[in-house]
Design a protein with these regions (language model features):
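Structural signature of hydrophobic alpha-helical transmembrane segments
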Residues: 9-20, 74-85, 124-137, 198-209
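Hydrophobic alpha-helical segments
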Residues: 22, 86-89, 93, 111, ...
Length: 212
């Protein structure tokens, strides 16, 4: 039979905006001068454009071992936050044009990429992975200040993050063991204190976010 080619319209396109920060950031140490500055601005603008053309729906679904990872869960709320993080990224890049330290620039790129990943994650494992990228990028941003105070603050933040991350992971594991599903949905709370394992999982997940 004849091959059929489907024309993909703008409303059907999904490119994860974090790609422009996480993968795009890898070229930062290679580039120099104005070329680097222009490149960073272009990457941030492309990420913003990716959010503009993102259709509502579920995208980027991959099977990993026995888990289903969903990288793109797009609705009105997630799109609003994606816009916010992209705009923050653009402003931050323009503000940091004078920064010469490639490590600091790379950490900033990874922070925004992690934030976008968290915003669009459709399952808790994907959310946790991007949350870790976001959190560790924050630590390196603090450490790149290279003062005695920033080193102390960075270690303190790292301690809190590891604690919060373990609590969050415990909640995710309990949820998965109970339901066999990592999809992000409602949190079944019954009052302020968990009364069963299902609400305990939700409680730990929320506490993990708060601690972080």
């Amino acid at each position: 039979g004849l091959c059929r080619m489907k024309i993909i319209t703008m409303s059907e396109m999904f490119i994860h905006p974090s790609v422009f920060f996480i993968l795009g950031g890898l070229l930062i140490p290679i580039l120099r001068g104005r070329g680097k500055q222009s490149y960073m601005v272009v990457m941030a603008l492309l990420a913003f454009l990716a959010v503009v053309i993102m259709p509502h729906g579920t995208y980027g679904i991959y099977e990993f071992l026995e888990w289903q990872l969903t990288f793109g869960n797009v609705d009105k709320l997630s799109k609003v936050f994606a816009y916010i993080f992209c705009i923050m990224g653009i402003i931050g890049i323009i503000y940091s044009i004078h920064v010469k330290n490639d490590g600091e620039l790379l950490a900033a790129f990874y922070y925004v990429g992690g934030a976008l990943g968290v915003t669009l994650a459709g399952d808790f494992l994907t959310l946790f992975l991007f949350w870790e990228i976001m959190a560790f990028s924050s630590v390196f941003l603090i450490w790149y200040r290279k003062s005695e105070f920033s080193v102390k603050v960075g270690y303190r933040y790292l301690l809190w993050h590891v604690t919060g991350g373990l609590i969050l992971l415990a909640g995710i594991i309990i949820k998965y063991n109970l339901s066999g599903d990592l999809t992000i949905n409602h949190f079944p709370f019954h009052g302020w204190w968990p009364t069963d394992l299902q609400s305990l999982a939700s409680f730990l997940i929320v506490i993990g976010f708060i601690v972080n």
